[in-house]
């Protein structure tokens, strides 16, 4: 593949460019936040097409935040579109009411391009994966602690790599190359994440680490905010997605979102190879990536282990065979995909 799949990301790290969210904060729009939702969305979509300008008005990020909070009145952040009035404390499908952070730390186990990564894990998830290795986070949306947006912003600013001498910037446990929003899944906490970024001033890339089951509306709000999508492409068909993650209409939603997200930002696509699912899932996913996503990095992952409720599903109630993983990598290499190593 021509060019580096993460060239813009590296320009930010090298101080040659600005993180997208900072540019969105500087993009001024003339808006009355008391307008109805349709008018606000219309303004939002038109603002995406215009160059940033500096006149009196309101930050484009503030408009995004207002729309995100309005979505909590009848929650449609993810494609379950449960309609819960989360703004009034009603629980939706994910069970998340207020943002709770399960943990936050400098992660050294992500893809080489990302480490050290300041990873913020939210409790709760939009999926119900029977093999979830983070089930203690994803299935307990009331666990973890609440933090103010300002507090999280200050924590991010404390991790910015540019604060440290150049000889300390590689694999140093005290700073990060990026902010990595994850869970569970971060989608349920999108309004809070936008609040955090409103309070933050660090020129640091933002990574959206997600199952990509969010709505088009949520994805629009991330446009101009996220620098790298770190996606989790789990299944190659709707049957497996419904059976193992209770995710209806999976292929249409996740394929659509990958296409849209790739237009917005750079991308690393993760695929965890599942036992017994190379032909039904791994092969079609890798084929689809090769045909539909240009200049992305792909991580074919072998980390599967039977966890959570996997014992109730015969084909995945065992570790992944090395021959299965090798076959998936062979397929990816045969397609010319840019693999992470």
Locations of regions flagged by a protein language model:
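Pocket-edge positions in alpha/beta enzyme catalytic cores
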Residues: 144, 246, 317-320
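Generic domain-boundary/flexible-linker signal
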Residues: 86-89, 131, 140-143, 190, ...
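Auxiliary Fe-S-binding modules of radical SAM enzymes
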Residues: 1-88, 262-267, 271-341
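N-terminal [4Fe-4S]-dependent radical SAM core
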Residues: 42-122, 130, 134-141, 167
């Amino acid at each position: 593949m021509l060019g580096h799949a993460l060239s813009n990301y590296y320009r930010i790290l090298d101080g040659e460019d600005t993180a997208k969210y900072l540019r969105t904060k500087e993009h001024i729009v003339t808006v009355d936040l008391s307008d109805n939702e349709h008018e606000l969305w219309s303004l939002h979509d038109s603002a995406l097409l215009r160059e940033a300008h500096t006149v009196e008005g309101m930050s484009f990020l503030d408009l995004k935040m207002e729309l995100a909070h309005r979505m909590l009145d009848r929650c449609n952040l993810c494609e379950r579109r449960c309609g819960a009035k989360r703004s009034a404390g009603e629980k939706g499908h994910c069970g998340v009411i207020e943002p709770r952070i399960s943990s936050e730390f400098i992660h050294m186990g992500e893809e080489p391009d990302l480490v050290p990564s300041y990873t913020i894990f939210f409790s709760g998830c939009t999926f119900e994966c029977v093999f979830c290795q983070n089930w203690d986070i994803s299935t307990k949306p009331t666990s973890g602690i609440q933090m103010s947006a300002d507090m999280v912003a200050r924590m991010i600013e404390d991790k910015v790599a540019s604060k440290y001498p150049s000889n300390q910037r590689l694999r140093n446990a005290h700073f990060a190359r990026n902010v990595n929003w994850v869970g569970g899944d971060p989608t349920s906490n999108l309004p809070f994440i936008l609040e955090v970024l409103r309070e933050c001033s660090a020129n640091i890339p933002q990574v959206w680490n997600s199952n990509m089951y969010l709505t088009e509306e949520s994805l629009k709000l991330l446009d101009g905010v996220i620098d790298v999508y770190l996606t989790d492409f789990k299944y190659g068909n709707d049957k497996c997605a419904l059976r193992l993650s209770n995710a209806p209409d999976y292929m249409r939603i996740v394929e659509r979102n990958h296409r849209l997200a790739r237009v917005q930002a750079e991308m690393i696509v993760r695929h965890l190879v599942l036992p017994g699912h190379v032909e039904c899932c791994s092969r079609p996913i890798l084929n689809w990536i090769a045909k539909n996503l240009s200049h992305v990095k792909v991580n074919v992952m072998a980390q599967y282990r039977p966890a959570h409720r996997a014992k109730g599903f015969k084909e995945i109630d065992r570790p992944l065979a090395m021959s299965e993983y090798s076959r998936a990598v062979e397929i990816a290499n045969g397609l010319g995909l840019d693999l992470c190593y």
